[in-house]
Amino acid sequence: MARLTAITSKQQVAPKDQPIVDAIVASRGALQGPFTMFLHCPELAGRLAHLGAFVRFEGTLDMRVRVLAAMTVARELDAVYVWGAQTGQARKLGVPETTIAAVRENHSRGVPAEDAQIVEFTRTLLRRHRIEDGTVKALRARFGDDGFIQLTGAIGYYSMLAMTVNACELEAAPGAEVLTPGATA
């Protein structure tokens, strides 16, 4: 059970903050997940929704790459809600079950090279907080400078979501795949 009451309607926030709720619903279709927690600080929720709209919907980075990064963040930070949301999207985008299992179980066996590059970059950035020059060079060659920064920004964005759902103990959405925190191969 979440540590804070989920804010699921604009009637739960001050009238001055209701346009923020309207904007979030307009961009996402509903109030759900981390935003039900972020709305305890409506100004932050609004700013994050704006960032999230770019990261999730407007950037030029391939959606599959974004989802692989988000799924890896969820695994690395044991974010149950984020994992459930991202694995469903990964399957819709054709990410192989072997890749999803490898991320879930913290290994890289059977992961296609292009997917492994994203998973390993995300893991390394979150674990070591630094990246080798060769890795950066390879990512820049694949995505360009803009894409490299979009990927890095997506990792940061999903890390913020993961930390919030963890601090608030937000559980996976009904029907979503459940992540076992700390599970490894």
Question: What residue spans do the PLM features occupy?
Answer:
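Hydrophobic alpha-helical segments
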Residues: M1-A185
